Amino acid sequence: MAEKRPLGPLGPMMYGKLPRLEPDPGPGHSLPLSASSQDSCNYKGAYFSCPIGGTSKAGSERLASWTPYPSLYPTGVAGSPLRGDNLLTNCLLYRPPTEGSEKIQDSSELLPFGPQAHAYPGPPLAAPKPVYRNPLCYGLSTCLGDGGTKRSLDGDWTLVTGPLLPSADPPCPLATAPGKGQPLDGTFLRGLPSGGPGKDSSLPFSPCQAFLEKYRTIQSTGFLASKYTSPYPGDAKQAMSEGPSSPWTQLAQPLGPPCQDAVAAHYPLPPPPQALPCPPSCHPEKQGSYGSLLPLPPLGAHKGAAYQAGGLGSPYLRQQAPQAPYMPPLGIDSYSYSSAPLPAPSPGLKLEPPLAPRCPLDFVPQTLGFPYARDDLSLYGASPGLGGTPPSHSQNSVQPVPQPGAFQRACQPLPASQPCSEPVRPAEKPTPEAQEKMWLPSCRKEQLQPRPNERPGVPIVIRDSPVPRTSPALHPCAKERQSVPQKDARPPSSPPMPVIDNVFSLAPYRDYLDVQTPEPRAERDSAPATSKSQDKDCKGNLPAQDGASRSHCSLREEVALDLSVKKTMAEGVPVKVPSPEVHEKPAEAVDGPGIENTVSGLPGLKKMVTEIPEVTAEATPRTNFHSSVAFMFRKFKILRTAPVPAAIVSSPTTPAPVPAPAPAQPVPNPPSVPVGLQILTQPLPVACFNLALPSPPAIVASPAPASAPPPSPAPAPAPASGPAPSSAQVPTAAPVDSPEQHFTGLHTSLCDAISGSVAHSPPEKLREWLETTGPWGQAAWQDCQGVQGLLGKLLSQLQKFVCTQRCPFPHVVRAGAIFVPIHLVKERLFPKLPPASVDHVLQDHRVELRPTTLSEERALRERALHGCTSRMLKLLALRQLPDIYPDLLGLQWHDCVRRQLGGFDTEARTLSPSEPTVTRDEPESQALAGKLPAPKVKKPGRKPPTPGPEKAEAATGEGSRNPSPSSGASTSPPGPTLRARFRNLLENAWLNGVALPTWGHKASGADRSSPHPQLLGSQTHHL
């Protein structure tokens, strides 16, 4: 509503510029402090009340007794006493018609208050009688109390009508205006006509208006001369164009006529709003400064005048907000206060120290033209002009809504949720009464742009201001002025917003992703969600300023809000710093590095990948869209890389059955493919490998060759699987994938490897091992070729049984634990070991065998163990088998060595090993029967002469197999000589690495020779 009122040069801002007088100005100042405690407007300064003419002696005396600080006033003004006959009305200093303008200048220069802010001259003062009596408090009787002196002033304001200024309200003495107003410069009264202020005048203007007009016409008054040539009723825009070029021209100047007669009667007269430091027509950034440093008559005075232009009578006005004290420039005439700002920044502004962007600007005058009090800066809002750091947000100072004049920008704080994206008067915190700061929606639609060419005054840096603030709607003048800096301002580097009602499109981002700009950040609002709507309004209202405002907002956010984005900006295009994105988006953290690796070879994709973390990092306002972008890119990446892994995996999977390691090799071959692809392809080769792993060992004999070929120097390991599997080959072939067969095959291969190692070792070495190694001979047998690998596989199988609780052997489950009968260890796995030795190992490991219950024993017997005794059915925890298994293997090795070195009596050696084989001819132990005849490992050596094994007891057979060592003794007759000869042959065969025929099972020997080709065939088939 305030915006709709007619534009006038005077607005509430002018009233806000009245200075606060120090409560204790000094020895030369006798200004009494008025009851500041009664000030409901939080005004704590002294109230200076002046009677009109001589109506109130107390007021006149008070004025006479007051003398200004000489140092603060110009030299010509310092010594001149305040003229008692001058009329210092509540709102208007006007002189009696008898005195000349010179005297008025003297007296006016001494006045530190009054309508000083009106820097523009008005037409000649036509109305001799001041019309306004209402003090600055706008009828708030509690403002200054009802002193007799103040009441006496009422008589002089006889023109005031009841509706305009309720007579009941004591006019706050002009000093209240000083609290809010500007010091009355000498120039303010220089324009007073010598005969203007007589009470006999009946012109329709308010005296203030007439005074201002007169003030405006005076060209010789100093700082106002030649500045305000437009007539009083002249158009505001005309005044704007005619604005002075003084350093103050950039300050907000009222655009409307100085006074518009009593229209404000329609509105109640609440206290003046906090004067907006900066009208929209001028610097939007000078929010903290005394934006319109126009000398303003006190609000009360203009209020009676129906200050329409200022909107003072509007119901929006609440309590008088503490205003920043106005500080006049160095001299009265040193700066001219123009009613209209020049479109171009005045050069005088450049003299001021440069201001940090987005900081409210203020001018610090070198010399103050009036004594002002800065004891409580909080009352002033943030008044950096005082030279001290203003309180950024005075929590306890009531700062009502600034009622902007029609010409003024309403600077209005936004909700706290919105971060401040532009400089705003820091003191304008919303108060209970300030809730209607939201009354003007356009005020929140603007984002203030600091103009680089105008940085005068001391910057007010709002460090931790939680209250987001936006500058009010800019005047056309300000828009024009701001459009100039926008030309050189860099447009936002991000593409247009593609989200419409949560429906996104990547089309706008195509060029954005392909061609990165130095700052490829999406449009960023200073506020997360609420600023979105604000932005929409801003775009509608200020399309020209949108780009620059965005860039400035983003700059501010970099400093205050989003450090990660700032880092990415600083680092530039090539490196986009995925680390912030990893912290902010843990869900995408996994993808971020992977994506970069994946597309390392693809430059086009690399750009998109490096960009995605950046976009997602700043996605706070538009999380849905950016997460969607990330998701789309993730999907795109998968589609892009999926075909490659398929090709890679398919090639290894087809040959996978033959070599298990084959799948692993093709995968490393495409390291030319990005690492990201390997991440996708690796699981498949691993899966293939896992699938291939069970199949080869499924056959009892297959694992042995698989591990045996690596140790090529020793041909023993491969045939080791052949001895007993000849008989076990047929049953095992059917259940190829049986875990039991797999485990049994591993165990058999391991035992055969140990036996072969012992058979190939010379007796001296074996004796040395027996002496040096421990009771189980771990160190010796673990050095055997292929033993370590087989042992690892077998132990892993046992662990797998324990973890999966799927044991292939007869077992019992107790409380989730698997127990196997000891029969598995003593009869099936290690049938050659003496039971006492196995028990000894169990004792060493403190393994407890638990008896079975009747039901468990019945179940075990029904399952497989029909003829087992109860001792053999005692339970061993399967989880303990991996612990004792290596020691049991050590026992196996030790037994083999002992048999190898036991008695060289061939008869004893032939009988002892064969007996266990005969007794253990049961089907369940057939697969393990071949372990005992360890010398069978040398079968490859015997393989060419197949009949060799059949002549185990004939010296000729041995001679034919090894003619070189035993050729001379081959003709010896049988008998004792034959035995000695045989012993000789055995020793030679041992030294030559030939398998020792120490057992008499000729049929089994013949069978042993034949199944070996089948084993090889089966191995090739399955592997």
Curated annotation (Swiss-Prot):
Residue ranges with Pro residues bias: 706-722
Bias kind Polar residues: ranges: 391-400
Chain spans, region Disordered: 1-35, 381-501, 518-551, 703-742, 907-980, 1002-1023
Keyword Acetylation assigned: yes
Biased composition, class Low complexity, residue ranges: 963-972
Coiled-coil region(s): none
A cellular component term, taken from the record's GO annotations: cytosol
PTM annotation (Phosphoserine): residues: S206, S383, S493, S494, S912, S964, S972
Alphabetized InterPro entries for the sequence: DUF5525
Biased composition (Basic and acidic residues): 425-436, 443-454, 477-490
The keyword Phosphoprotein is assigned to this record: yes
N6-acetyllysine modified-residue sites: K17
Positions of post-translational Phosphothreonine modification: T389
Keyword set, alphabetical order: Acetylation, Phosphoprotein
Database matches in PANTHER family: SIMILAR TO HUMAN CHROMOSOME 15 OPEN READING FRAME 39
Name listed for the protein in its UniProt record: Uncharacterized protein C15orf39 homolog
Species this chain originates from: Mus musculus
